[in-house]
């Protein structure tokens, strides 16, 4: 059954047929569909990609290894969907990929998705001492990109920092950085997002 649905995605020859085929494949909730759902990210069909991403998030942790290995280095749109999906699943195995994407990817959409994801990972799933060191690595990256020239990256860094602020060891450096940014950032939207983070 799933093979037929996978073939349906491969054979879809219009954007509308692709969306319908991906919807049907998503409903199967079958791990065998994971590679095809990830491949849909590269088909230049935002509706189909969004459906595929939602399906992968619903499958959860079982999708993470293939999401990590199938990241598209050449198509930044596909890469952004992969990063957003990993961020939504929030499995800490994605930490290094999210750090790399947030700090170095050339596509702002990829960097923003990764930055937000870094504040949202399920750290409790890590064993000691990784559950101590991993959030600090995320913090270092977010502090670094909070100085980026692009305001939307700084904004995403604040979202990520807000996600980490519940970790006691990280509260002081986060509060300090947000105060610095509130006093110095020229972008009104960034300052507004800082105030929101501080009010939570």
UniProtKB/Swiss-Prot annotation:
Keyword tags: Antenna complex, Lyase, Phycobilisome
Record's GO cellular component terms: phycobilisome
Any matching Pfam family: HEAT_2
TM region positions: none
EC assignment: 4.-.-.-
UniProt-recorded Gene Ontology molecular function terms: lyase activity
Domain of life, per lineage: Bacteria
EC class name: lyase
SUPFAM superfamilies the record matches: ARM repeat (SSF48371)
Quaternary data: CpcE and CpcF associate to form a lyase.
The protein's role, per its UniProt record: Required for the chromophorylation of the CpcA gene product.
Protein name, UniProt field: Phycocyanobilin lyase subunit beta
The species this protein was found in: Nostoc sp. (strain PCC 7120 / SAG 25.82 / UTEX 2576)
Gene: cpcF
């Amino acid at each position: 059954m799933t093979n037929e649905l996978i073939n349906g995605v491969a054979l879809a020859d219009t954007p509308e047929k692709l969306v319908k085929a991906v919807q049907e494949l998503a409903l199967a909730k079958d791990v065998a569909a994971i590679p095809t759902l990830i491949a849909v990210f590269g088909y230049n069909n935002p509706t189909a990609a969004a459906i595929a991403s939602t399906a992968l998030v619903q499958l959860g942790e079982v999708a993470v290894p293939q999401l990590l290995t199938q990241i598209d280095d050449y198509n930044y749109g596909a890469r952004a969907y992969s990063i957003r999906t990993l961020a939504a699943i929030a499995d800490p195995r994605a930490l290094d990929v999210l750090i790399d994407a947030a700090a170095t990817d050339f596509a702002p959409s990829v960097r923003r998705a990764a930055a937000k994801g870094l504040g949202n990972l399920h750290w409790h799933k890590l064993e000691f001492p990784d559950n101590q060191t991993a959030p600090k690595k995320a913090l270092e990256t977010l502090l670094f990109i909070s100085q980026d020239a692009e305001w939307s990256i700084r904004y995403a860094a604040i979202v990520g920092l807000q996600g980490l602020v519940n970790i006691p060891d990280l509260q002081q450096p986060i509060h300090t950085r947000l105060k610095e940014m509130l006093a110095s950032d020229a972008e009104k939207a960034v300052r507004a997002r800082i105030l929101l983070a501080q009010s939570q």
